[in-house]
Amino acid sequence: MKIINLTGAALDWAVGTAMKLPPPYWADGKCANFSTDWAQGGPIIERHHIEICHLDNGEWRAQLNANQWGFHCRHYGETPLIAAMRCYVASKMGDDIEIPEAL
């Protein structure tokens, strides 16, 4: 599945997988909601220096300048957390990943 299409449980699963967490993914004693809960997604944004910007069209853009060669990952979303988590997953796993059918 293309990262640009990930939302909800599928996006949260991808974030947990990118972080190499064992399923089920837990954060603060509850099931992880990285793409909707700032307490869970915010530390990822801070730790990986993901830049977030609101665009004139209402979307959010997140980008990650990852190395000295200028490689950057850029993704968009309806919210800052969705954009940032898509960017994080793509930086770790590429722009196209396999998602379990149950999600």
Question: What are the functions of these language-model segments?
Answer:
Residues 1-103:
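Glycine-rich anion-binding surface patch
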